[in-house]
Curated annotation (Swiss-Prot):
<dbReference type="InterPro" id="IPR001737">
    <property type="entry name" value="KsgA/Erm"/>
</dbReference>
<keyword id="KW-0963">Cytoplasm</keyword>
<feature type="binding site">
    <location>
        <position position="127"/>
    </location>
    <ligand>
        <name>S-adenosyl-L-methionine</name>
    </ligand>
</feature>
<dbReference type="InterPro" id="IPR023165">
    <property type="entry name" value="rRNA_Ade_diMease-like_C"/>
</dbReference>
<comment type="similarity">
    <text>Belongs to the class I-like SAM-binding methyltransferase superfamily. rRNA adenine N(6)-methyltransferase family. RsmA subfamily.</text>
</comment>
<feature type="binding site">
    <location>
        <position position="56"/>
    </location>
    <ligand>
        <name>S-adenosyl-L-methionine</name>
    </ligand>
</feature>
<feature type="binding site">
    <location>
        <position position="102"/>
    </location>
    <ligand>
        <name>S-adenosyl-L-methionine</name>
    </ligand>
</feature>
<dbReference type="GO" id="GO:0052908">
    <property type="term" value="F:16S rRNA (adenine(1518)-N(6)/adenine(1519)-N(6))-dimethyltransferase activity"/>
</dbReference>
<keyword id="KW-0808">Transferase</keyword>
<dbReference type="InterPro" id="IPR011530">
    <property type="entry name" value="rRNA_adenine_dimethylase"/>
</dbReference>
<dbReference type="Pfam" id="PF00398">
    <property type="entry name" value="RrnaAD"/>
</dbReference>
<comment type="function">
    <text>Specifically dimethylates two adjacent adenosines (A1518 and A1519) in the loop of a conserved hairpin near the 3'-end of 16S rRNA in the 30S particle. May play a critical role in biogenesis of 30S subunits.</text>
</comment>
<dbReference type="InterPro" id="IPR020596">
    <property type="entry name" value="rRNA_Ade_Mease_Trfase_CS"/>
</dbReference>
<feature type="binding site">
    <location>
        <position position="29"/>
    </location>
    <ligand>
        <name>S-adenosyl-L-methionine</name>
    </ligand>
</feature>
<dbReference type="InterPro" id="IPR029063">
    <property type="entry name" value="SAM-dependent_MTases_sf"/>
</dbReference>
<dbReference type="GO" id="GO:0005829">
    <property type="term" value="C:cytosol"/>
</dbReference>
<keyword id="KW-0949">S-adenosyl-L-methionine</keyword>
Length: 291
């Protein structure tokens, strides 16, 4: 067994060898606790038939743990300075492919078909860069990729929002979007002390398993999410005010919007954060016919 990368000593040794300096703009924080990495991989439930996608491998700490368990690992790294380091640290493994590209610009469908030929179980497992967490997760979900799901580490406050329930302060349009596509569960909290450099916030690991079907029936997905976003535009305002002020033609259609709310058993004085996904689905399906 090769010596783990994710220890304070080995990580510092690698960084010093290459004279690597962290780029704050890329949200680089390297994990130096092997036990936490192993737990993350455990939560992903990989087998020797699984293809794993990683985003932001850093110096390869999580990548090597994935390589020991998965059939193949494909990792997207945006920072060119890390490529020679990864080539060195991951040289003992023959089942890893590093792609030097911004994952937000990548054609992941093509990568999956080329790199994971014949594999039916594909998981995303990553310690996501904090500054682009939400765009990355939403791209992975809205691109309708053939993945089982993802196990990702992110800022704890973002994880709380993804898994939040109606009526809580963390519940918002992001919670609904994530839970529309996946079953979301926060599986572990990670203290800031196990990173180099140490971030200002704690992290959490969230597991998102893709749903075969959304939990609600909506006639127009794009309009459903438009209604959801409008409802949370100003959290302290009522659902009626938010819809009137933030939907196209909302002001001209105030009476119709109020009538639809009443007909769908939603008190116009309620706030968006109190509505369940089922209520948002009923509301958007009804609004679609009057706006």
């Amino acid at each position: 067994m090769n010596k783990d990368i994710a220890t304070p000593g080995r990580t510092r040794e690698i960084l010093e060898k290459y004279g690597f300096s962290f780029k704050k703009s890329l949200g680089q924080n390297f994990l130096i606790d092997t036990n936490i990495l192993r737990k993350i991989v455990d939560f992903a439930e990989l087998s020797d038939e699984t293809g794993a996608i990683e985003i932001g491998p850093g110096i390869g700490a999580l990548t090597e743990q994935l390589a020991r368990r998965a059939k193949k690992v494909v990792a997207f790294e945006i920072d060119q300075r890390l490529l020679p380091i990864l080539e060195d640290t991951l040289s003992p493994y023959g089942n890893i492919r590093i792609i030097h590209q911004d994952v937000l610009k990548a054609d992941i469908h093509r990568v999956i078909s080329e790199e994971f030929t014949g594999m039916t179980d594909i998981m995303v497992v990553a310690n996501l860069p904090y500054y682009v967490t939400t765009p990355i997760i939403m791209k992975l979900l809205t691109d309708r990729l053939p993945i089982r799901g993802m196990v990702v580490m992110l800022q704890k406050e973002v994880a709380d929002r993804l898994a939040a329930k109606p009526g809580t302060k963390d519940y918002g349009s992001l919670s609904i979007a994530i839970q529309y596509y996946t079953e979301a569960e926060t599986v572990m909290t990670v203290p800031r002390t196990v990173f180099i450099p140490q971030p200002n916030v704690d992290s959490a690991v969230i597991r998102l398993i893709k749903r075969k079907q959304p939990p609600v029936k909506v006639e127009d997905e794009a309009f459903f999410f438009q209604v959801v976003r409008a409802s949370f535009a100003q959290r302290r305002k009522t659902i009626l005010n938010n819809l009137v002020n933030n939907l196209p033609n909302g002001k001209a259609m105030k009476e119709q919007i109020e009538r639809v709310l009443t007909e769908t058993d939603i008190d116009p004085r309620r706030r968006g954060e109190t509505l369940t996904m089922e209520e948002f689905a009923a509301l958007s399906n009804a609004l679609q016919h009057v706006l």
